[in-house]
Amino acid sequence: MWLSPEEVLVANALWVTERANPFFVLQRRRGHGRGGGLTGLLVGTLDVVLDSSARVAPYRILHQTQDSQVYWTVACGSSRKEITKHWEWLENNLLQTLSIFDSEEDITTFVKGKIHGIIAEENKNLQPQGDEDPGKFKEAELKMRKQFGMPEGEKLVNYYSCSYWKGRVPRQGWLYLTVNHLCFYSFLLGKEVSLVVQWVDITRLEKNATLLFPESIRVDTRDQELFFSMFLNIGETFKLMEQLANLAMRQLLDSEGFLEDKALPRPIRPHRNISALKRDLDARAKNECYRATFRLPRDERLDGHTSCTLWTPFNKLHIPGQMFISNNYICFASKEEDACHLIIPLREVTIVEKADSSSVLPSPLSISTKSKMTFLFANLKDRDFLVQRISDFLQKTPSKQPGSIGSRKASVVDPSTESSPAPQEGSEQPASPASPLSSRQSFCAQEAPTASQGLLKLFQKNSPMEDLGAKGAKEKMKEESWHIHFFEYGRGVCMYRTAKTRALVLKGIPESLRGELWLLFSGAWNEMVTHPGYYAELVEKSTGKYSLATEEIERDLHRSMPEHPAFQNELGIAALRRVLTAYAFRNPTIGYCQAMNIVTSVLLLYGSEEEAFWLLVALCERMLPDYYNTRVVGALVDQGIFEELTRDFLPQLSEKMQDLGVISSISLSWFLTLFLSVMPFESAVVIVDCFFYEGIKVILQVALAVLDANMEQLLGCSDEGEAMTMLGRYLDNVVNKQSVSPPIPHLRALLSSSDDPPAEVDIFELLKVSYEKFSSLRAEDIEQMRFKQRLKVIQSLEDTAKRSVVRAIPVDIGFSIEELEDLYMVFKAKHLASQYWGCSRTMAGRRDPSLPYLEQYRIDASQFRELFASLTPWACGSHTPLLAGRMFRLLDENKDSLINFKEFVTGMSGMYHGDLTEKLKVLYKLHLPPALSPEEAESALEAAHYFTEDSSSEASPLASDLDLFLPWEAQEALPQEEQEGSGSEERGEEKGTSSPDYRHYLRMWAKEKEAQKETIKDLPKMNQEQFIELCKTLYNMFSEDPMEQDLYHAIATVASLLLRIGEVGKKFSARTGRKPRDCATEEDEPPAPELHQDAARELQPPAAGDPQAKAGGDTHLGKAPQESQVVVEGGSGEGQGSPSQLLSDDETKDDMSMSSYSVVSTGSLQCEDLADDTVLVGGEACSPTARIGGTVDTDWCISFEQILASILTESVLVNFFEKRVDIGLKIKDQKKVERQFSTASDHEQPGVSG
């Protein structure tokens, strides 16, 4: 490539001059190419350690003048061919012109101008593609692709200098972190180390420091442990590695690949060595941290942050911290964790103004809101720019949010308005955060009753607080405490959140304020206000729609807090149904998961349907990520954290719990339902209060406190059942003595009776103990532990999926368990490669975790073609892609252009582990429909229908049993998806109302079992065109075999014999008076000994050294006897339905002469002369003149039994098909191609001399 000219002071230090003229020098890097000796090794080592560009471009051209000592680089090249092209251009276009100049300065100026012009011309047509990466970074990306053979689609994120510990020796080199791979390369004095690890294969990633490895990063895969150290900035490197591994786990979890953020703004000053991808990932990390800290919606993007102070009127202090600005919010977080948090939605802002600066208050900024609150920030570094950014965002904010914000905010400031709320104008408007229960609607106004306020108010007797005695007084005091807090710290979204707020939450939220504060602390209020009418729209869309999720919802509705009166009534049940169905419709990835019904029923007790819906959104999508999906990954991750915390805080108990296996049993129910399913309702709801304020750390603290309180009893337990019973009784007796609601006994407590109940435990005391003993947990630490556990959990689930898939493969498939697992990993890698590099962008090709394990990974025809070429024992040279396409169509039973692992293994097994008959059956079917390509289907219809004798009633015998192990629902899914409109709805309705009983499944199972009872007599007959294709395939298969000549002789003999059998069968059927187009049946077949044996002898190819055979050519036209072999190369007079059109375009594109026929005598034809487009036709009564201008004989046909019997007469063919091939070596080679596992190469460079 041409380079912008740069000075080079020392031209010959590490370079060898190969060509020169008075103005230019072509040089090669020392050590590149052959030899190089010790100098070459040293130069190569320097290039790697110093990251020299000479690794990518070992050739260069310098401009020089005779009297000057300075050289200028004008071009470089990665190959001799590339650099020679540039050299020749310079010689042809510049040499004569340069000789005219007198001044050397003019020569140099002219050359530099010319090179700059060439570069500008080349770049003129290049479209700008987002952020341009720095030149040094582009060079590193080229090195990475060249060194590791990565495609253009693999993007480099960053690269770092480090050492890889190979044994006890550190190898200095470069670590390349790409979107999908971790790569390392080192070259030191002839020793080369190359590593490639897929992020999806990593099972452990941690930063540690030991005596052996000072500050190192450990990377574990299923096969090995890798250690990297001596980083310049190990913290940055590890953080980026964590992020990339997280992206890979997310891809395994839900197939969400990495997509660049096109909306990321360009930097004002381009960073020198930071790529656009690195900036993108850094921005993502900051956005995620920002959203998690302030509980903001998932689409909120951080614009920037700056240091400042905030004036807090409640304690008259200036609190230092950070201000964060995003599209819709201004947030503040104090440096001290509990000092103050603040969230100001821009929709609430009325005035932003710069106040007067003073020595006490430098650069102040005042922000006023609609709720009459004013916030004063100071010590802002760039106040003018900040005000401008806020103004820009305010201009984009709608001036009036739907839902009457102003009227609701009046009640936020003045709590007295809560007692007399004004009715809303429409059901789509969300309620006030200060009074979420205020919206009342007449139930008779709608066809279905809608819970427009918390169900607790509707189903609880409205007795005055005075009648409740001490409990009522305590509740009144709580309300007063919160109202005082609101007066001092503000009410609503803009509340100052301090340590005092947490203290009030721990004392319990009064029931009248619970729904409001849940909405505020969870961030659900922000989403509800910004999406007015969204829930009502979802309810309308989802009404009457049936799916698997709605069926599961209906099944669980009556299991949701059945002990509570609100859910013993149709009003509560209907509200719960609408909320769960609306969420399943909003998020089909989750749909519905068990335990969502229990949590949602509690949310409905304290809020309207819309509020409960948005609280559920906050819970499922932000606060408990990945909890409520088919594999409850999030809960399993937190279960792993719980086990780790138990080891840290309760080491005595940890080992005992592991032995009993209790943690895995208890933690899922505790975490998924937030203790609601294991504690009395009035106690568990206090934990939910703290959860919405603090997050998952409260659940973990309480779980540890429960184990700590029962340590002695647990240590004395002998089995899991005893431990579970003891813990269950303890939790049943956790009481809330301050609750004003009538006590609702826990369902399990009602069903179990005990003469010796344990002592009651106060829930507030349990919370107090949990904070005293385990409050050292921090949100950042939990996120770090979540990453570590997520790797383990997802890889464990992947291993479970692999075992499940392997178990679903029938035992008679022939492969061992290890071979099946290796094949599965290769198959999975091919699928993932399509996700990495966009080979398969169709939604059908993407992984769907909701499908059965067997159907989750599928590959398309192009991916299968690559796997087939590398794994098949039937190597056919250039014919292999055609054979692979036929095999794919044969295995693709449901015609969705994708095959799963079971179908793939079935095809492989037929080639590797079948006996002679089974292998020939596979080969035979590859030349019959459905192996014909879709393009061939129309032209092949007539012949296929005739030759298969009602092919529509016969399924592919090889693929007929492929779905035996799939559930009936999976088999039904495809036809339903293909239909559209009302038809699919009707089917869905039928499915929702009546499901098939067990007899239906038994009938289906019996039908599938019957399909396996296929004999060779059931195979359809093969016509002449198909037989010719079979012969071509066999000739190609034998081309690379050591017994090539013997196999050619044998197949020539068999082919001529079968051709004559077909001819005789056709004549015999004609004599018996059958229809002329009928094929010969098994009874019509004449005995083989009656055929002329001398004809078969004539058809055998001569020896390779026979000179007559080479000289014969096709000069013997018309001289062949009746038993001669006819070579047909095409025909132009065929009709539309002729069998010659059964070939696809790919199979006929190499035809040399489509309209000519030539008859070659048997003696003059060699096996080497048979091209791909050569077909063999022969017969006793078939004269060459009858064929000229005609078509391939459509009445000719032959059966599989005849082919099998003929091949059995040739021992060399029998030995070829019975030969055992080890698939292990082919799998190993394919793994290297796919880079399925970490591969480390340690090579010595040859020829160290001098």
UniProtKB/Swiss-Prot annotation:
It is a single-pass membrane protein. Residues 142-209, 288-356 form the GRAM domain. Residues 984-999 have a biased composition (Basic and acidic residues). Residues 414-443 have a biased composition (Polar residues). InterPro entries: EF-hand-dom_pair, EF_hand_dom, GRAM, PH-like_dom_sf, Rab-GAP-TBC_dom, Rab-GAP_TBC_sf, TCB1D9/TCB1D9B_PH-GRAM1, TCB1D9/TCB1D9B_PH-GRAM2. The keyword Repeat applies. The record marks Q594 as: Glutamine finger. Residues 397-443, 974-999, 1069-1093, 1128-1157 are annotated as: Disordered. GO terms for molecular function: calcium ion binding; GTPase activator activity. The modification Phosphothreonine is found at T397. Its main location: membrane. SUPFAM superfamilies: EF-hand, Ypt/Rab-GAP domain of gyp1p. Residues 879-914 form the EF-hand domain. The record marks R555 as: Arginine finger. The arginine and glutamine fingers are critical for the GTPase-activating mechanism, they pull out Rab's 'switch 2' glutamine and insert in Rab's active site. This is TBC1 domain family member 9B. The gene is TBC1D9B.
